[in-house]
């Protein structure tokens, strides 16, 4: 299956061109989360309108084709989040907060998506976090139902076990963990596809590294707003520049 992957949007509409060009040649479109907090002085109204365009795309192409993951810059606008983090805008909270609450409640915004051994989430799923928060006897199919039931399982963890304020710790959730910690402690026997940590793909041809479980870790948060097409049969990922 071919999947169009749209990395962290951060209030931009860069995704529209990639979707328009590729929507008919792919089976799925996965948005990796972080729809808000651009840090580039985009007005909250423009940001919210752009987010609603993504929702309209999902309605137009179908809920099965368009997958919307949640990121940390979305979660902190919900009523479930106990903290506020970098980029937080009170105006965005007023405009979008209740909508985001509803989208979590109705399952539109999900924590993960899995297909044929490829596991998508905003930042990655660690073995440690999964066992602590989902359960040792659980499976990936349990992640989204439990998140919908108890959204605070993704809160940033700040205690004696999580010394990194950057989130580079195996106890952090799929909206917070960083690549180093994830690579050393990946959940299960899955390739993982993540956003969250930005990379410059302008001078490189590969968007992946190998994790400690021998599987690939694909990065999708591009400083230049590239998108990606993943072929789940071959494992190849095309960078759309």
What do the predicted segments below correspond to?
Residues 79-83, 131-134, 206:
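Short aromatic-enriched loop/helix-cap "lid" or pocket-rim segments at secondary-structure transitions
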Residues 10-14, 37-39, 73-79, 126-128, ...:
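Active-site environment of divalent metal-dependent phosphoester hydrolases
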Residues 91-95, 109-186:
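Active-site-proximal loop/helix segment associated with metal-binding centers of metalloenzymes
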Residues 5-7, 29-34, 68-72, 120-121, ...:
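Active-site neighborhood of phospho(di)ester-bond hydrolases with catalytic His/Asp-centered motifs
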């Amino acid at each position: 299956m071919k999947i169009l992957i749209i990395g962290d949007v951060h209030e931009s509409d860069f995704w529209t061109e990639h979707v328009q060009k590729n929507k008919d040649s792919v089976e799925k479109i996965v948005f990796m989360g972080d729809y808000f907090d651009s840090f580039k002085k985009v007005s909250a109204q423009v940001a919210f309108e752009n987010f609603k365009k993504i929702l309209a795309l999902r309605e137009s192409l179908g809920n099965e084709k368009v997958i919307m993951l949640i990121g940390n810059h979305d979660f902190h606008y919900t009523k479930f989040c106990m903290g506020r983090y970098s980029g937080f805008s009170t105006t965005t909270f007023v405009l979008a907060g209740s909508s985001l609450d509803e989208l979590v409640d109705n399952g539109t915004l999900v924590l993960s998506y899995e297909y044929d051994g490829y596991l998508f989430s905003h930042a990655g799923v660690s073995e440690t976090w999964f066992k602590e928060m989902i359960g040792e006897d659980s499976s990936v199919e349990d992640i989204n139902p439990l998140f919908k039931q108890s959204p605070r399982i993704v809160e940033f963890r700040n205690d004696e076990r999580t010394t990194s304020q950057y989130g580079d710790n195996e106890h952090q959730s799929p909206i917070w963990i960083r690549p180093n910690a994830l690579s050393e402690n990946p959940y299960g026997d899955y390739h993982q596809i993540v956003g969250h940590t930005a990379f410059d793909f302008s001078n490189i041809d590969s968007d992946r590294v190998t994790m400690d479980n021998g599987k690939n870790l694909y990065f999708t948060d591009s400083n230049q707003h590239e998108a990606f097409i993943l072929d789940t049969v071959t494992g190849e990922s095309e960078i759309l520049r």
